[in-house]
Each structure stands twice: as C-alpha cells, then as structure tokens.
Amino acid sequence: MTLHTSPILHSLLDTDAYKLHMQQAVYHHYYDVDVAAEFRCRGDELLGVYADEIAHQVDLMRFLSLNDDEFTYLSSLPFFKPDYLHWLRGFRFNPQQVSIKNNAGKLDIRITGPWREVILWEVPLLAVISEVVHRHRSPNVTAEQALVQLSASLESFRQHSADVDLSQFKLMDFGTRRRFSRDVQQTIVTALQADFPYLIGTSNYDLARRLDITPVGTQAHEWFQAHQQISPTLANSQRAALQMWLREYPSHLGIALTDCITMDAFLRDFDLPFAEAYQGLRHDSGDPVDWGEKAIAHYQRLNIDPMSKTLVFSDNLNLDKALALYRHFGQRVNLVFGIGTRLTCDIPGVKPLNIVIKLVECNGKPVAKLSDSPGKTICQDQNFVCELRKAFDLPRVKKAS
C-alpha cells in the first residue's frame, strides 16, 4: 500500500467551529479537567490497515499553529476573549496523546490528556481518517465528480421545491469530519456559495475565514458528557452544562444540543429560564418530526412563541430530507439545516465512512451518550449507564454499543 506522506491538514482552523467555542469555555472553567476519547466505526469496516498512515498524519499535525491572519480573524468575532486567543496562539497538537493501533484489522484510537487540548483532536482526526481511506479506496475520484453530483442534487432540489416559498430556507455546511477530502469540501462550499442562495454558513472555521462565510456551531455531546462527572450531582449535570454555557456565552452561540441523555430528559431540564435564554435547539438523533413536535409543544407550554426560536436539524440530512422538514415545520418555527456527509462525500461509487470520536471518560470516570437513537449510544460502563438512566428517570432500552 502506497504511503501518502504530505500533510492532509494545512490549518489549525480546519475544524468545526464548535470545537473552538467549547475549548474556550473549557479553558476558562475546566482548565485542569482530564478526559479520554475513543474512535468508533459504526459499520463493520476494518480500517486497521490504515493505522500507520493515519499515525503519520497525526505526527504531522504537531506543526499546525494559528498564523497572524487567523489570529486577527478570530479576534474580530464577538465571542472570543483575548486571554483564550493568546493561549490558542501557542497551542500545538501533541501526538503523544493519541494511541493508534491495528487491532486484528480493527482501527483502535484512544486520545487522553487535558480536556482543553484533547478537545481539538476529534474533527481534524476524523477528516484525516476519512481522506486517508478514500485516497486508497477511490484514488481516481476528483472534486469535479463531486461537483457534478452536487449540480444534480441542486437541480433536483429546485424541481421538488418549485411550489414552496424558500425565503426562510437556511442551509449550513457541516461536512468537515466525514468529507471525501479537504479539496472536495472547499469545492462544494464554494459552489454552494455561488449557486445556492440559501447557504448561510459553514462549521469549518478555515473555510469561513477564506471564503468570507459565517462560521456556525455551538456545543457538542462532549460538553454535556463531561458534566456527568464534573457536576457534584449526576441528576443535575445537564442543567449544570446548560448553565455554564450561558455563563461563558450569555448573548451568543445559543443553540442547545438535546440528545446527550434523550430529548425527553433534556426537556425536563430545559425550563423557562433556559428556554428564554437559549436561541433554540439542535436535533442530532431520533425521528426528526417527533423531535420537532416535542420542541414546539414545549415552547408553547412555556408560553414562548416558537417563531421566536430556531430549530437546527443536523442528523444524517440531505437536501430532500431538509425540504420535507421545511414543508412540515416552516410556518411554525424558524429552521436551519446542517448537512454534512451528503454534501462533502456525496460521490457516485463512494461509500462514506460512518465514524465518530466520542468522550468515554472524564477525570478517570465513565461518561455516556445515550441519544435518541440506540445505535448512537456510547458508553463502556453498563453500571454507569444504569446510574444515568436512574438519575434521569429513563426507561430501559437496548444495550449500549
């Protein structure tokens, strides 16, 4: 197997925006917290054969740093503080935090260290894994082929939406982590910027800066997971996470992720003060229509006009699914659609990887993501899952994977 030695990543900002948003909050409030995260391939693919090449790319990541233009760009945004940005300027990836093994054909990756540092590994490392695998599996695929497929998808969208008022349709690129390649993502986002007036942003800070697009993203599951061990009381951990986020970002980045414990448990914690303070909610697992109906009903019970709030859908979307949700909810609540893999790895003959890196420990103790989709549940410690379900008064479900 040919080893590609040139670096895949060229910028520290080639990551999802919410990683920097969370990192700043961790830097300010949880500087000494340690965590562990692990790689999961949700399919049955054996990716261990690529371990050496992935490890080489991880080693090259130690040379990435914030340059002057990037520092100036981040400084222009209203929610970053000078102390964090000066610290970030000195940040370097430490490859010794990452263990990569070919375990009988299975790819094993474990990342350990201070949360403020470990937090930045997930997205660029997933992008590296995806690009390494696709380089070998589809060596002749070009960005032009991705562009042809995008053109067909946009034409289909235009035909299917001809009878719909799209003035409030909003699309965000969420495609960094499982992209076919860095080049393909840039090609796709550039094309959308030129040809699709409903694109409002990208989660990728590097592309946002270079293409002058709005960067988008708030927090991920790990923010809520870590609080399961940071909070003195497990049953209060989700509220603690929501409250600390508001402490760091009282007037920005106000979309809350709902499915770390399940939507029902989230809504029990999401009382009137939180519902008023947060701009809206993000869906990432479970039936999107059921979820949206629950969200709207919750706002109505609290006497909050749903049209004053925003629902962000980001779970395995494509343009057709987004359009169906827009038809269903568009007159009742503000909507934004985050599409990832179906934009940046939507190429005929190419099978996208279903890969994640998730937090598994905080301060040496287990954390869990239960989700609204059993297949997305992550925890190694079944006793802790039982504790979590009891603390949040959840019914028994399928065994965690």
From Swiss-Prot:
It is an enzyme of class 6 (ligase). It catalyses: nicotinate + 5-phospho-alpha-D-ribose 1-diphosphate + ATP + H2O = nicotinate beta-D-ribonucleotide + ADP + phosphate + diphosphate. One of its GO terms (molecular function) is nicotinate phosphoribosyltransferase activity. One of its GO terms (cellular component) is cytosol. InterPro entries: N/Namide_PRibTrfase, NAPRTase_N, Nic_PRibTrfase, Nic_PRibTrfase-Fam, Nicotinate_pribotase-like_C. Pathway: Cofactor biosynthesis; NAD(+) biosynthesis; nicotinate D-ribonucleotide from nicotinate: step 1/1. GO terms for biological process: NAD biosynthetic process via the salvage pathway. Keywords: Ligase, Phosphoprotein, Pyridine nucleotide biosynthesis. Transmembrane segments: none annotated. Transiently phosphorylated on a His residue during the reaction cycle. Phosphorylation strongly increases the affinity for substrates and increases the rate of nicotinate D-ribonucleotide production. Dephosphorylation regenerates the low-affinity form of the enzyme, leading to product release. Its EC number is 6.3.4.21. The modification Phosphohistidine is found at H221. CDD domains: PncB_like. Catalyzes the synthesis of beta-nicotinate D-ribonucleotide from nicotinate and 5-phospho-D-ribose 1-phosphate at the expense of ATP. HAMAP family: NAPRTase (MF_00570). Belongs to the NAPRTase family. PANTHER family: NICOTINATE PHOSPHORIBOSYLTRANSFERASE. This is Nicotinate phosphoribosyltransferase. It comes from Pectobacterium carotovorum subsp. carotovorum (strain PC1).
